[in-house]
Amino acid sequence: MRAKGKLGTWILIVSLFWGGGSAPAADTLRDIRVLSQDARAYITPEGAEQMRNAAREQDRQDARYNEQFFAPWRQTQPRHGVEEIVRAFRRCLNRPGYADNGRRHAPEWIEGLQASAQFETYPNARYAGMTTRRTDVRILPTKQPRYADGNTSPFDLLQETLLPVNTPVFVVHETRDKAWLLVETAWTVGWLPAEDVARVDETLIRSWESGPYVTVIRDRVPVYGVEGGAFLFDASVGAMFPLAKVREDGWEILVTVPDRGRRGVVLTAFADRAAVERKPLPLTPENVAGQINTLIGGPYGWGGMHGNRDCSATLRDLFAPFGIWLPRNSMEQARQGGGVINLKRLDAGAREAQIASRGVPFLSLLWEPGHIMLYLGRMHGEICVFHNFWSVKARDRKGRVRKKVIIGRAAITTLHPGREFQKKGLRTSDRLRELWAMTLLPPAL
């Protein structure tokens, strides 16, 4: 009986630990429970008409997308000077941060990385390349993380972004041991493991630039070699490839793989029909909503950590299949095109009126410093947005965090997520009041 009592006590402790003692689940956020998480529910006849008008501009935008995508292959010199690259090392040297074991990095660690970068020879590479797998762009040439603190921060501050497989790059510089390459793409700059990049020649470049193209519309799509059927890599939403042949069961596409000397070789590969479409995917409300639904629930990943997406990567990948080019950074996305509407100096009511009267559902970005969202329209009288975000915090009158709900995924919410926690003197951030700008994407101008 005594043993049974101990077992019962143990079960109770475990249940409290995993149940009542744990952080609230993402679906405890009222917006996510109440609002439809099916983007098709936000399509209206008026919004559909606005998008049909915008679709007339799509071919021009798609041509611009392709031009930007391949731009690194036409570079002969780096766009970023050595001082700009060295500045990242200096910032980290002043604040080395913490390692994944919770201990503070030694300044000597940063100094060693800078010495290995041999900046006295910058730029020592200067050639065209292509990624041969999905790969992380790092701010410093290391896979070791740098956290803001040793206990609670889940974000690696050395993570810049994630590059899809078969992304054109301009290789600017290499470390002394040749293990890391500093590369530029049309939307980022940073360090890649040399094993993830192949050098490409003019013949390969021509085979890629000639088109036509297909675009991936699902995540983690396996790609196989046509000869032998070997698995080559997986590709995710927004990746693009030259089309070789249409088959009843799928698509034959051209892909780049490395040879033993890490030079790029073009192979014919195969991808499933349901996961790939011709690029650009027609710009219709149904297609945009379908792509949102593909991304809904996708885990949040700071800078693309673990192959996931943050707010700006989510929107960039959402619009890539449609041939609509977006930069990688949320601030740069907000400056995209010429349709930027300043909301900063307006009160909350005037901001809401501007969004309702001038916003084009599914083609308007709402930006606040550090975060970006897609305007979907209204439901239950409220402005609704699609975005990927980490958490909602409730603070007391002194600004101290008293409640934090981890969302950590892409979802549809109002501009007031978490307002149900605004009680007993607590307040949550009001995204409507924090908005600085609304941007109409180029097709909607």
Question: Each predicted region: which residue ranges?
Answer:
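Conserved beta-strand/loop element in small beta-rich adapter and peptidoglycan-binding domains
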Residues: 152-175, 229-247
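Active-site nucleophilic cysteine motif
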Residues: 292, 302-333
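Aromatic- and glycine-rich peptidoglycan recognition patches
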Residues: 27-37, 45, 187, 195-215, ...
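...with weaker cross-activation on analogous glycine-rich loops/strands in unrelated enzymes
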Residues: 162, 327-396
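Bacterial N-terminal signal peptides
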Residues: 10-19
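Short, structured beta-strand/loop micro-motifs enriched in basic residues and often containing a Trp
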Residues: 132-154, 213-227, 342-351
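Boundary regions of SH3-family modules and the immediately adjacent low-complexity/disordered segments
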Residues: 26-135, 154, 184-218, 249-289
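Second-shell loop/turn segments in exported
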Residues: 153-156, 228, 274-279, 297-306, ...
